[in-house]
Swiss-Prot record:
Protein name: Large ribosomal subunit protein bL33
GO terms for MF: structural constituent of ribosome
HAMAP family: Ribosomal_bL33 (MF_00294)
Matches recorded under InterPro entries: Ribosomal_bL33 (IPR001705), Ribosomal_bL33_sf (IPR038584), Ribosomal_zn-bd (IPR011332)
Gene symbol of the encoding locus: rpmG
Pfam families from the UniProt entry: Ribosomal_L33
Record Gene3D superfamilies: Ribosomal protein L33
GO BP term, pick one: translation
Superkingdom of source: Bacteria
Family as reported in the entry's similarity comment: Belongs to the bacterial ribosomal protein bL33 family.
GO cellular component, one term: cytoplasm
Key words of the record: Ribonucleoprotein, Ribosomal protein
Length: 62
């Protein structure tokens, strides 16, 4: 799980948005870091989903 950081750089979890809608079991999640000072909004990156076997949009979850 993401741990608390003392500075502006924090760990965030990215979860696939297309996988939830497909109804297939399992989830595709990535852990990355972001700088809260530079990117205040939630991250949205294209990452590879091994279950769907293609690149999909992954959004930051709380």
């Amino acid at each position: 799980m993401a741990k608390k950081a003392k500075g502006n750089r924090v760990q965030v979890i990215l979860e696939c948005t297309e996988h939830k809608d497909s109804g297939m079991p399992g989830t595709s999640r990535y852990i990355t870091t972001k700088n809260r000072k530079n990117t205040t909004e939630r991250l949205e990156l294209k990452k590879y989903n091994p279950i769907l076997k293609r690149v999909t949009v992954h959004k930051e979850i709380k």
